[in-house]
Protein backbone atom coordinates (compact mmCIF):
# COMPACT_ATOMS: atom_id res chain seq x y z
CA UNK A 1 0.00 0.00 0.00
CA UNK A 2 1.34 3.44 -0.95
CA UNK A 3 2.08 5.90 1.86
CA UNK A 4 -0.52 8.60 2.45
CA UNK A 5 0.32 11.94 0.89
CA UNK A 6 -0.17 14.98 3.02
CA UNK A 7 -2.78 17.29 1.49
CA UNK A 8 -1.54 20.72 0.46
CA UNK A 9 -3.11 23.56 2.44
CA UNK A 10 -4.32 26.47 0.31
CA UNK A 11 -6.01 28.64 2.92
CA UNK A 12 -6.78 29.25 6.57
CA UNK A 13 -10.02 31.04 7.42
CA UNK A 14 -10.87 32.30 10.90
CA UNK A 15 -14.50 33.15 11.65
CA UNK A 16 -16.64 33.88 14.71
CA UNK A 17 -20.14 32.50 14.22
CA UNK A 18 -23.11 32.06 16.57
CA UNK A 19 -23.24 28.41 17.64
CA UNK A 20 -25.67 26.36 15.55
CA UNK A 21 -26.50 29.32 13.31
CA UNK A 22 -24.03 29.13 10.42
CA UNK A 23 -25.71 29.88 7.09
CA UNK A 24 -24.51 30.74 3.55
CA UNK A 25 -25.24 34.46 4.06
CA UNK A 26 -22.40 36.88 4.82
CA UNK A 27 -19.93 36.62 6.53
CA UNK A 28 -19.73 32.82 6.10
CA UNK A 29 -20.65 32.46 2.42
CA UNK A 30 -18.22 34.96 0.87
CA UNK A 31 -15.32 33.88 3.09
CA UNK A 32 -15.70 30.20 2.14
CA UNK A 33 -16.74 30.82 -1.46
CA UNK A 34 -13.51 32.68 -2.16
CA UNK A 35 -11.63 29.47 -1.34
CA UNK A 36 -13.99 27.20 -3.28
CA UNK A 37 -15.31 25.36 -0.22
CA UNK A 38 -18.75 23.73 -0.33
CA UNK A 39 -20.57 26.26 1.87
CA UNK A 40 -23.61 24.15 2.78
CA UNK A 41 -21.41 21.20 3.73
CA UNK A 42 -19.48 23.43 6.15
CA UNK A 43 -22.65 25.00 7.57
CA UNK A 44 -24.20 21.60 8.30
CA UNK A 45 -21.01 20.27 9.91
CA UNK A 46 -20.50 23.43 12.01
CA UNK A 47 -24.11 23.56 13.18
CA UNK A 48 -24.01 19.90 14.18
CA UNK A 49 -20.72 20.37 16.07
CA UNK A 50 -21.93 23.47 17.97
CA UNK A 51 -25.51 22.35 18.67
CA UNK A 52 -24.87 22.02 22.44
CA UNK A 53 -23.32 25.53 22.73
CA UNK A 54 -26.27 27.57 21.43
CA UNK A 55 -26.27 31.19 22.56
CA UNK A 56 -22.48 31.52 22.42
CA UNK A 57 -20.26 32.85 19.67
CA UNK A 58 -17.88 30.02 18.77
CA UNK A 59 -14.73 30.91 16.82
CA UNK A 60 -13.72 28.40 14.16
CA UNK A 61 -10.48 27.91 12.24
CA UNK A 62 -11.09 26.37 8.81
CA UNK A 63 -8.18 24.79 6.94
CA UNK A 64 -8.83 24.60 3.19
CA UNK A 65 -6.91 22.06 1.09
CA UNK A 66 -5.91 22.03 -2.58
CA UNK A 67 -8.70 19.59 -3.52
CA UNK A 68 -11.25 22.04 -1.97
CA UNK A 69 -11.85 19.79 1.01
CA UNK A 70 -11.64 21.31 4.48
CA UNK A 71 -11.14 20.62 8.17
CA UNK A 72 -12.27 22.88 10.94
CA UNK A 73 -11.26 23.30 14.56
CA UNK A 74 -13.61 24.86 17.10
CA UNK A 75 -12.16 27.26 19.66
CA UNK A 76 -13.62 28.37 22.98
CA UNK A 77 -15.94 31.41 23.00
CA UNK A 78 -14.15 34.79 23.29
CA UNK A 79 -13.30 35.82 26.86
CA UNK A 80 -15.09 39.14 26.36
CA UNK A 81 -18.37 37.38 25.50
CA UNK A 82 -18.05 35.04 28.50
CA UNK A 83 -17.35 38.01 30.80
CA UNK A 84 -20.36 39.93 29.49
CA UNK A 85 -22.56 36.89 30.08
CA UNK A 86 -21.17 36.43 33.64
CA UNK A 87 -21.73 40.13 34.45
CA UNK A 88 -25.17 40.13 32.81
CA UNK A 89 -24.28 42.95 30.41
CA UNK A 90 -24.94 43.66 26.73
CA UNK A 91 -21.63 45.45 26.11
CA UNK A 92 -18.57 46.78 27.90
CA UNK A 93 -17.78 50.37 28.84
CA UNK A 94 -16.83 52.96 26.24
CA UNK A 95 -14.38 54.50 28.73
CA UNK A 96 -13.33 51.47 30.82
CA UNK A 97 -10.82 53.15 33.14
CA UNK A 98 -13.21 55.85 34.35
CA UNK A 99 -16.67 54.31 33.98
CA UNK A 100 -17.25 50.83 35.41
CA UNK A 101 -20.30 49.00 34.04
CA UNK A 102 -20.40 45.74 36.00
CA UNK A 103 -18.82 43.37 38.48
CA UNK A 104 -17.68 39.76 38.39
CA UNK A 105 -16.30 37.68 41.25
CA UNK A 106 -12.88 36.05 41.22
CA UNK A 107 -14.70 32.67 41.23
CA UNK A 108 -16.44 33.60 37.96
CA UNK A 109 -13.10 34.72 36.48
CA UNK A 110 -11.51 31.37 37.44
CA UNK A 111 -14.47 29.50 35.91
CA UNK A 112 -14.02 31.42 32.63
CA UNK A 113 -10.26 30.75 32.80
CA UNK A 114 -11.00 27.00 33.15
CA UNK A 115 -13.19 27.18 30.04
CA UNK A 116 -10.59 29.11 28.01
CA UNK A 117 -7.47 27.33 29.35
CA UNK A 118 -6.80 25.36 26.15
CA UNK A 119 -6.79 28.53 24.00
CA UNK A 120 -4.77 30.70 26.38
CA UNK A 121 -1.00 30.54 26.53
CA UNK A 122 -0.94 30.21 30.30
CA UNK A 123 0.81 27.45 32.22
CA UNK A 124 -1.59 27.25 35.15
CA UNK A 125 -5.06 28.38 36.11
CA UNK A 126 -3.79 31.38 38.12
CA UNK A 127 -2.01 32.82 35.08
CA UNK A 128 -5.11 32.17 32.95
CA UNK A 129 -7.27 33.94 35.57
CA UNK A 130 -4.95 36.98 35.43
CA UNK A 131 -5.38 37.14 31.64
CA UNK A 132 -9.18 36.99 31.99
CA UNK A 133 -9.13 39.60 34.80
CA UNK A 134 -7.12 41.91 32.53
CA UNK A 135 -9.69 41.49 29.78
CA UNK A 136 -12.44 42.33 32.30
CA UNK A 137 -10.62 45.50 33.40
CA UNK A 138 -10.20 46.64 29.80
CA UNK A 139 -13.97 46.27 29.33
CA UNK A 140 -14.88 48.33 32.40
CA UNK A 141 -15.85 45.31 34.50
CA UNK A 142 -14.61 45.27 38.10
CA UNK A 143 -13.16 41.99 39.41
CA UNK A 144 -13.98 41.47 43.09
CA UNK A 145 -11.92 39.25 45.36
From Swiss-Prot:
GO molecular function, one term: large ribosomal subunit rRNA binding
Subunit annotation: Part of the ribosomal stalk of the 50S ribosomal subunit. Interacts with L10 and the large rRNA to form the base of the stalk. L10 forms an elongated spine to which L12 dimers bind in a sequential fashion forming a multimeric L10(L12)X complex.
Signal peptide segment: none
GO BP terms, alphabetized: translation
HAMAP family according to UniProt: Ribosomal_uL11 (MF_00736)
Alphabetized UniProt keyword annotations: Methylation, Ribonucleoprotein, Ribosomal protein, RNA-binding, rRNA-binding
Record-given protein name: Large ribosomal subunit protein uL11
CDD domains for this protein: Ribosomal_L11
Cellular component terms per the entry's GO annotation: cytosolic large ribosomal subunit
Family statement: Belongs to the universal ribosomal protein uL11 family.
Record note on modification: One or more lysine residues are methylated.
Function: Forms part of the ribosomal stalk which helps the ribosome interact with GTP-bound translation factors.
Organism: Corynebacterium glutamicum (strain ATCC 13032 / DSM 20300 / JCM 1318 / BCRC 11384 / CCUG 27702 / LMG 3730 / NBRC 12168 / NCIMB 10025 / NRRL B-2784 / 534)
Keyword Glycosyltransferase part of the UniProt annotation: no
Amino acid sequence: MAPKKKKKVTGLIKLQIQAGQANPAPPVGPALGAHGVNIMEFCKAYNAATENQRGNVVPVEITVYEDRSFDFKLKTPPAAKLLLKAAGLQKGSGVPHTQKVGKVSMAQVREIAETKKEDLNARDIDAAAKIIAGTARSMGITVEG
